[in-house]
Amino acid sequence: MKPRNIAIACGVAGVAVGLAAAAGIVYRKQIKSAASLKRLTDYADDYDLYGIDIAYDYDLDRIIAAGVRDDQAYIDAVVAQVLPGVPAHVQAPQFACSAFVAVDAEGRVRTGRNYDFKDDTSALLVRDHPRGGYASIGFAALNNLGDNTPLDSVAGRAAALMGPFAQLDGVNECGVSIAVLTLDSKPCDQDTQRPVINTSLAIRLVLDRAATTQEAVDLLSAYDMHAMAGRDYHFFINDAAGDARVVEWDPRDPDRAFKATPVTQVTNFYACYGDEVLPNQKNGELGHGKERAAAIADVLDAHTGAQDEAVAWKALRAAAQEPNPEDITSNTQWSVVFDNTEPAAAITLRRHWGDIDAFAL
């Protein structure tokens, strides 16, 4: 599988003029960010990989302070910071997937991740260098941002600026990676009088502020969780030391107690109740997809101590899913291998296993 490098740049001047006209005011750093938007692949179905470098500043604490107990409040708080006064359509993200950790003979740590969702989407590679935070690279689904071809309109370019707040996965400069996966339980909506974060903010907080998995666990456990888009979720977190854990909110606890369970792979079932989950079936609130986790485990176990990048891709292929309109967690939209030791990402869209694009942080 040979990595490809395709870059179709948008016109910097056109983006700057268009965004300024749409907003009625020149946002220097927002314009610089929008001008960086590029199409990185060129598939016939127009569902492509795009990339954007985020140059504007944001304040996560201010977004949290605004209150994010419902999805619209979160979207409004983000838009108010990123594009005040500019209409931008964003919908609450939706998520599925498989994730695992792999360690090769030299001790290099990688995270594999399939993003599965029934509706096709373009992907947005987001490079972020937050002021006072860790640089990171990760991916958002452009259908969640309202435009699968964002270079075709000013509104699409403006929506792409929201990428950092709609990411589904990523890795930061410290080697901490995070990926979100959907569950079958009732959406978590904790109310223990702590500050509230939601699914998307959890990803942003970990990438910006956590240097290890333990720091990520400590960070997330300090907040109440509001699950977005009417579904429930958990997070697979890994770091440069290979400390892989699944962070969840216990569906059997009335207060949705926070749990962090060490695992090597997970899909759409509760890791904290993994022994009760059966493959090839729904398991009520405990979830489904254990057969995909078993397929990953079979590949990794066959290469214990030598789980290199090729093995990681083999495991991703073993767990990838074809389209099924009746199953929200079908249809692998992208597969990515994050390097936690030397932070980087390699990605392919929609099971095009011969087309892998590699990106350094």
Roles of regions detected by a PLM:
Residues R204-L207, V217-L220, A297:
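Non-transmembrane alpha-helical segments in soluble domains
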Residues E215-R231, F235:
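Secretory/export targeting leaders with adjacent low-complexity proregions
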Residues G230-N280:
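Extended amphipathic alpha-helical segments with heptad-repeat/coiled-coil character used for oligomerization
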Residues K282-A312:
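Long, charge-rich alpha-helical interaction segments
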Residues T212-E215, L219, R292, A312:
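General structural feature for long, well-ordered alpha-helical segments within catalytic domains
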Residues G133-N143, A271-A293:
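A recognition module on extended beta-rich or small alphabeta surfaces enriched in W/G with H and D/E
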Residues K2-A210, M225, A306-L361:
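N-terminal mature-domain region immediately after signal-peptide cleavage
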